Amino acid sequence: MRVALTYNEKRTASASPDDADAEFDSREAIAAIARLIAELGHPITPIDVSGPIPRLVDELARLTPDVVLNLAEGERGTFREAFYPALIEQLGLVHTGSSASALAVCLDKALAKRVVAGAGVRVPRGRLIRATDDPRLARSAMARVPLPAIVKPNFEGSSKGITAASIARDRAGLADVVADAIARYPHGVLVEELVDGIDVGVGWFAGIGLLPPIGYRYDGEIYDYALKHLTPERVQLEIPPPLSVAVARRLAVTATRAFVALGITGYGRVDLRITPQGDAVFLEMNPLPSLTLAAGHDELYVAAARLGHAPRGVLAAVIDAALPRGQPRQLCA
């Protein structure tokens, strides 16, 4: 089975404070994934999608892959993560992971929260603020958000735009934080109550099921960009974290509801906070979580290993889940 591996190559240093390509993959990370796919017996061709789109279309036409292992995050626009899956779908090829429509919904954090809230999942109280909003209405909306509050970009992932300075404890400070965030992310920022609790991620792979929850322990109030990308050694992973049976069961139910409500297929990871009272609060859905094997960023593989699945088997599950969804090798001109 011929596999094309689409991705965006990271151009900056892995520990760069610039978050422009924080979601992209290094050559080393892609090479490690490609080696495992080759060990499964599949000829694989990595393709850096950065650059002219016609070049990518021509390359896919030449390869006629049976499946596209898509890790591309996209570079521009509020729905960039959905672009390459949409293109692949329009070319008549199959790709791993969720559909373009599911990716588009999940990248809009405010919309994703409305969807899961409709499925009975608790979400933080908050408001979406855009650069084009009427200032008076924006101030009124922010005034209804409980303090302390956190301000985060609505259309970003990988904790981009989230720092210790994203937390506001009074109304004047909140206005300043929002103004700074809007200047950088004019498409919109989420202003939300800062939910007290511990950060937990729950991964899921078709053919494997829910993974043991991943607990993130660190000094500070939030799992921000610096902790995730600059100093990951300061984060302690607990797989699983120490949760009571009742809380663990509640977490699994909440995670499952979120995956189903958002139409996640193939694989994904939902991020939540467990409150001191044991409630699971939805933070965001990552329908395209990192599959890197690099230490400190390989928590999905570590969680899968708790169930007896090696990285090669995890990647096999990702590919196998994509195969029923369409007809391979029907590339449209």
Question: Language-model features: where?
Answer:
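ATP-dependent carboxylate activation and anion-phosphoryl transfer catalytic cores
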Residues: A117-G120, S244-A333
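Active-site nucleotide/adenylate-binding loops and adjacent lid/helix of ATP-dependent enzymes
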Residues: M1-T6, L60-T64, A104-L190, D196, ...
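Phosphate-binding site of ATP-dependent enzymes
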Residues: D170-V253, I274-V281
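Short acidic, glycine/proline-rich loop/turn micro-motifs
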Residues: S14-D19, K160-T163, H297-D298
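ATP-binding N-terminal substructure of ATP-dependent carboxylate-amine bond-forming enzymes
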Residues: M1-T96, A100-S101, V105-L107, L111, ...
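A short acidic/small-residue loop/turn micro-motif
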Residues: A131, R217-D219, L288-S290
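Short phosphate-binding/catalytic loops that engage adenosine nucleotides
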Residues: H42, L93, V121, P186, ...
